[in-house]
Amino acid sequence: MFERLEVMRKTYYALQEKLASGISDVKEITKLMKELKSLEDAVVAYEKYLSLKEQLKDLEELLELETESSVLEMAKAEEKSLESDIENLEESLRILLLPKDPDDDKNVIIEIKGAAGGDEGNIFAGDLFKMYSKYAESMGWKVTLVNTTPGSSGGFAGIEFIISGENAFSYLKHESGVHRVQRVPETESQGRIHTSTAVVLALPEQEDIEYDVKWEDIRFDTYNSSGAGGQSVNTTYSAVRLTHIPTNVVVTSQEERSQHANKDRAYKLLVTRIYDKIQQEQLEKEGESRKALIGRGNRSEKIRTYNYPQNRVTDHRIGLTINRLDAIMEGRIDLIIEPLINEIQKEALEGQSK
């Protein structure tokens, strides 16, 4: 591990020198900056580790020479504290050296669809959208709507949006799956608890992929943007539908005001969907081990239950139950995301040690 960290540190400073040498090529600068950033956390942690090891060495030398009992007592307490800090830092370094998901630093495209439960499923899809929006706001990220299909009684039959921000996908990629809600609908006169579901899909936004997406392979259609009940909300054909004929991937964008902006947004979405389709086909070939490795899991599995009467949320993947549903629906999904990421990292570390 430490040989690898030493190589990373040397590479990090070599990149800094190269950037300081006055490179004018913007693409080259961007590439170097990205590489530098990918090394930064590990290098900073490693240098802190080296500093603590040096402090511990000096302290041990002091303990060998010191005879004053009060000083010895203080030094031994500090030695114990340093050893604990070093042990914790070693664990952090092992995590930082785990294989990285190459998409972690990307923006995330989230699609939510009301599923079982009809109107109540759609209303819950709307609640999930608000939850993710508030979480994004707390992280300083931007939310951009791509498509909305309003539900007849509120919420959304379907909604698609992009969350843009540093490492957004790394935090939200584990949200894909079936989200189940248990509560009494407003229209329920007998006070009975109903169970409904919404399905979430989280994808990394792709700017470019190895697969060659050519405009001549894309069918381009325009139509009127529509609001609730299918009513037209403008008289221009600003909404865009793109169909990639070789893969039969279809995307739409209607939330931008101009056709040009919707076309740009739809193209990015199309590239992302094609990338995802290719990746899913590859995962099927490689089997479940690869799925587990990147931690994205089965999109059809029930991942979480939101129980309103008991103010309880349970994430079934790690057996985590939190009695703070009200806070979570107000955007505090970090209460679930952080333990989930920690558990995934723990499993990855255990896998490496086998």
Curated annotation (Swiss-Prot):
Keyword Cytoplasm on entry: yes
Chief location category: cytoplasm
InterPro entries in the cross-refs: PCRF, Pep_chain_release_fac_I, Pep_chain_release_fac_I_sf, Prokaryotic/Mito_RF, RF-1
Organism superkingdom: Bacteria
Gene3D superfamilies for the chain: 3.30.160.20, 3.30.70.1660, 6.10.140.1950
Keywords, in A-Z order: Cytoplasm, Methylation, Protein biosynthesis
Residue positions where N5-methylglutamine is found in the record: Q231
PTM description: Methylated by PrmC. Methylation increases the termination efficiency of RF1.
Any one GO molecular function term: translation release factor activity, codon specific
Annotated compartments: Cytoplasm
A GO CC term assigned to this protein in UniProt: cytoplasm
Family named by the database record: Belongs to the prokaryotic/mitochondrial release factor family.
Role of this protein: Peptide chain release factor 1 directs the termination of translation in response to the peptide chain termination codons UAG and UAA.
NCBIfam families linked: prfA, PRK00591.1
Name of the protein this chain belongs to: Peptide chain release factor 1
Protein source organism: Acholeplasma laidlawii (strain PG-8A)
